[in-house]
Amino acid sequence: MQVPKNNIYTVSRLNGEVRQILEGQLGKVWLNGEISNFSAPSSGHWYLTLKDHYSQIRCAMFKGRNQSVSFKPVNGQQVLVKGAISVYEPRGDYQLLIESMLPAGDGLLAQQFEALKMKLAAQGLFAADTKRQLPKNIQRIGVITSPSGAAIRDVLHVLARRDPSIEVIIYPTQVQGESADLNICQAINIANQRLEVDVLLLTRGGGSLEDLWCFNSEALAHTIYNSALPVVSAVGHEVDTTISDYVADVRAPTPSAGAELLSQDSDNKSQRLATVLSRLKQSASHYQLKQERRLSLLEHRLQRLDPKRTLQQFEQRFDEMQLRLEAALSNKLHGLSRRQQQLASRLEQQSPKHKLALETNRLSYLATRLQDAMQDTLNQSEQRVKYAAHQLETVSPLATLSRGYSITTDANHQVIDNAAQLSVGDKINTRLRHGQVQSTVTQITDES
């Protein structure tokens, strides 16, 4: 065997080129499969295997991608994934890197069922206090179902066996497939418009989750909730549960159980009827005896009554009421008179003439007070002026002159208090108590 010299691959190179070929050729793919070997380590990444009956492929979904998945995958679950084919080069493993994941088949329907269930529960459609009691004496049952299905046969058979007197009115509708929920809503609305039955039985036989899906409709849930007639939901087998079961006033596990719930056994019904009749007879007899005793008592009282005495009592009663009425009228008139006097007095006090007199007196009083206050103010001001004049006179230079002193100033009117301020020949002015003297300095003597 001849070995080529230039075209020998390393393992890393081979795995790298395989990865490039796979990623470049296939790109993004959608894949449907069953989960196995699922693991979620502390890193937050998911590792799993997707398989069908013949093959399997390893998959990885990293933390940044799996955080958008609205459910927790489990082994055995069918899922629909979108991802890119790649190769994990360190081991040479071919794998799918998942970007998005959805439940597939019944898994998706189950997820939608739980989401709608939570939404309607939050809106109060399942609340126990909104459930209506079923009528006690049901005469007519409205059955909403397919007229050709097994459910209607079971219902009619049970009713015929237990209570043939019950009348059945069928509101035919589609109970499977597209737009079946709208047909059921229409049948319920027709029954509510006619109001010809006592209760509605919504029913169909068993089937897959997909077969029963029309009973998981939000529109149907609101129609059942708003129905004026009580609704019993009897859909599928005992293990089947639909949204209509939660919203209905009563849930029955099967169509036959729904019919039994709404009917009474003939033997038991006859026995109960006999019991009711017996009680009615006893009640009638007791009532008759009671009325007879009451009639006898009234006859005895009537014999004891004297019409003349009764008339006198009424006359006396009339006189008493007349006196009380006269006293009440007198008191009322007296009260009205006092009220009138009070109002007249208040009116006089509120009259403009009275108010004018009051304001005139008040103005005169205020004028007197103002004049007195002004006189007091003038007297006080005069005293303050006299006191200030006396104080000024005490410190005034003129007061000093009156005691024989004089004030000498130079030509610039500056007071001379030192001979050194003058020179021979300066003109000076001497102010006496009476008059002034103009002088010329001829000699200066320093006495310091």
From Swiss-Prot:
It is found in: Cytoplasm. Its main location: cytoplasm. InterPro entries: Exonuc_VII_L (IPR003753), Exonuc_VII_lsu_C (IPR020579), OB-fold_nuc-bd_dom (IPR025824). Keywords: Cytoplasm, Exonuclease, Hydrolase, Nuclease. GO terms for molecular function: exodeoxyribonuclease VII activity; nucleic acid binding. Its EC number is 3.1.11.6. Transmembrane segments: none annotated. It catalyses: Exonucleolytic cleavage in either 5'- to 3'- or 3'- to 5'-direction to yield nucleoside 5'-phosphates. It comes from the Bacteria. GO terms for cellular component: cytoplasm; exodeoxyribonuclease VII complex. One of its GO terms (biological process) is DNA catabolic process. Heterooligomer composed of large and small subunits. Belongs to the XseA family. Bidirectionally degrades single-stranded DNA into large acid-insoluble oligonucleotides, which are then degraded further into small acid-soluble oligonucleotides. HAMAP family: Exonuc_7_L (MF_00378). This is Exodeoxyribonuclease 7 large subunit. It comes from Shewanella sp. (strain MR-4).
